[in-house]
């Protein structure tokens, strides 16, 4: 099994598990050992899945403004958790490939493996929900057909992205590419860099 086959299997498992209750407040029940990469992958997709549905809820035109503000702050915290987790996954890869002899002509990639895996997790969610739309009995035939066409593109994208990630990991493992990870350094959640939080008028 390739690494992305492993990822996609776990992501689909998460999405199925979440939709047993389909409730953003459902506690996570991560079945994988806490120290394993599978645990991190499961948690990553769980965060993405909950946030996906929070984003749906906050777009309700009749939402109470107080509830909307609370949701916005919850989404901000979720985004920070997501970023932190991506960096943990990159740390796993840096440790895994720390002994690799990097070739003199090795190149750097535009994004780290974990940020590509982040996109793969979100793509699994898009596929699940687009499939729902393509099969909606209460929607028009035109709607279902349009969504089926989009689903076909998403499935093709999943194949291509999975292959690209596996090739990137192979290139890193063989020294043809090297990892260099830059922390996200988000400013809006930091009381020392957000002017509103540190009191700048």
Language-model regions, residue ranges each:
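Anionic, Ser/Thr-rich low-complexity intrinsically disordered regions
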Residues: 1-201
């Amino acid at each position: 099994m390739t690494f992305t086959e492993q990822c996609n299997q776990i992501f689909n498992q998460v999405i199925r598990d979440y939709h047993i209750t389909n409730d953003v407040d459902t506690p996570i029940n991560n079945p994988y050992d806490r120290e394993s990469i599978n645990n991190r992958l499961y948690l990553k997709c769980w965060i993405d899945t909950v946030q996906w549905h929070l984003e749906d809820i906050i777009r309700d035109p009749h939402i109470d403004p107080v509830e909307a503000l609370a949701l916005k702050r919850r989404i901000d915290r979720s985004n920070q958790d997501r970023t932190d987790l991506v960096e943990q996954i990159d740390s796993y890869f840096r440790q895994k490939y720390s002994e690799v002899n990097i070739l003199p002509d090795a190149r750097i990639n535009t994004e780290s493996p974990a940020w590509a895996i982040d996109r793969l997790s979100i793509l699994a969610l898009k596929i699940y929900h687009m499939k729902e739309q393509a099969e909606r009995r209460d929607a028009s035939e035109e709607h279902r057909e349009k969504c089926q066409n989009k689903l076909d593109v998403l499935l093709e994208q999943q194949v291509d992205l999975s292959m690209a990630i596996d090739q990137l990991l192979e290139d890193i493992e063989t020294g043809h590419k090297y990892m260099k990870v830059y922390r996200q350094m988000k400013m809006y959640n930091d009381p020392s860099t957000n002017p509103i939080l540190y009191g700048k008028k």
